[in-house]
Amino acid sequence: MKYSSLLIAALGLLASRPAAACSRPPAAVSRPAAIAAAQDTTAEKMLAFQRSNGGWPKAVNEVKVDYRHPMSAADLAAARRDAGALDATIDNNATTREITYLVTAFRNTQNPAYKQAAENGIRYLLKMQQPSGGFPQYFPDTRFYRAQITYNDNAMTKALTVLKAVADKKGDFALVDAALVPQSQKAVDKGVQCILKTQYVQHGKLTAWCAQHDRVTLLPCKARAFELPSLSGDESVAIVEFLLTLDQPSPEVRRAVAAAVAWFQTSKIENMAVADITDPQEPKGRDRVMVAQPGSTLWARFYDLDTNQPIYVGRDGVKHARLADIENERRTGYVYAGTWPEKLLIKDYPKWQQKWPAP
C-alpha cells in the first residue's frame, strides 16, 4: 500500500499547526457549519490510522507511520481499510501522541471528529489497563512480552500522564467528555498502586524498577534477548518524575520517591563518559565506547537484580560487566549507559522535596 511508506512522526509533530481552511471566503469562517468542517491535515491522517478499538499502531507492515508525509485521498482510504487490525500500542509514543494532538486540534478547529477520536483513544487506554493497574505494551495483542507491564520507553508513564491530564481537566483535555474524568482518575490511582507494588526490593531495600514486570507476579521479567530482568537506570527516571506530579502524595509515594532517588545516587558510574568513535576495524567503521572523563557521571541502562552492578547484554542474552564485551552491533545500536537521572537529581527532586519531605 502507498501509505505503508510512512514513518513515525517525531515528538515535534505536536508543535505543528493545523492547516487553515484557506479556500473559504472570510465571511464563511464565522458560520458554525464552516467551523465544524474545519480540518487539520495531521489530525485527518491520525483519524485514518486509528483502529476500531480506539488505539493507534506505531507501524504498518513493519514500516513506521509519519504524519508529516503528504497523503492523498487514496492513501487515507487505504489506511482506513486497516481499522480492524489488532496492532494498537502505546510503544514509541503511539496512541498517547495522537490523543494529545487531537484534543488540541479540536480546540483549534472545533471539528467534532477530532474530539470523538481523542475520546475513543482515551477509552482505549482505560480498556487496556490490567487488573494490577499496569499497562501492557500492546492491546489486545498478547504475543511475546507485549502483555507484560511495560515501563520500557516510558510507555506506561506516558499513558498515565494522559489519563492524569484528563482527570485534572488540564488544558485542552478539559474539552473531552466529562464522563471520562472519574474513570481516568480511577485508572491513575490504580496505576500508582502498580508502580508502588512493582518497585523492586533488593536485599530488604526499595530500589527502582525493571523495564518490564510480569503482569501476574509483578516481578521484573525479560523482554528481548538483551533486555534481561534487571533494574533500569533509564525508565525508572520517568516513573519517579510521574510520581512527582501527584497532588498530595501519600506517605507510600514519598517513600518510593526517596528510595528511588537514593538508589540513583548509589548506582552512579563516576568519572566515565560514553563516546562514539571512528573505528575502521568495525563492520560499519564506528564504535561506541566508555572512556574515563573526570567529573562525568553515567548510569547503566541495566543493573543486576542481586549485585546491583551494571550489566551489558548482547543478542546472545549473556551478562557482561563491560560494554566492550558485547557485539559491536548492539554497542552502536542500543543505549546501554546515559545521564538520564541527572535533571531529576539536580533540579526536580530537590524542588519537590522542599514541599514533600520524606516521611
Which residues does each predicted region cover?
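Long, well-ordered core segments of solenoidal/helical folds
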Residues: 41-54, 117-134, 185-204, 256-273
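Intrinsic, low-complexity N-terminal interaction/targeting segments
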Residues: 56-57, 61-62, 69-82, 131-142, ...
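Eukaryote-skewed repeat-based solenoidal scaffolds used as protein-protein interaction platforms
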Residues: 115, 119-122, 126, 143-199, ...
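Terminal, non-catalytic domain-edge segments
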Residues: 20-42, 165-190, 216-223, 227, ...
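N-terminal carbohydrate-binding/catalytic regions of secreted carbohydrate-active enzymes
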Residues: 40-96, 101
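Solvent-exposed loop and edge beta-strand segments that line ligand/cofactor-binding
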Residues: 22, 28-35, 79-94, 143-156, ...
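Bacterial N-terminal signal peptides that target proteins for export
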Residues: 1-7
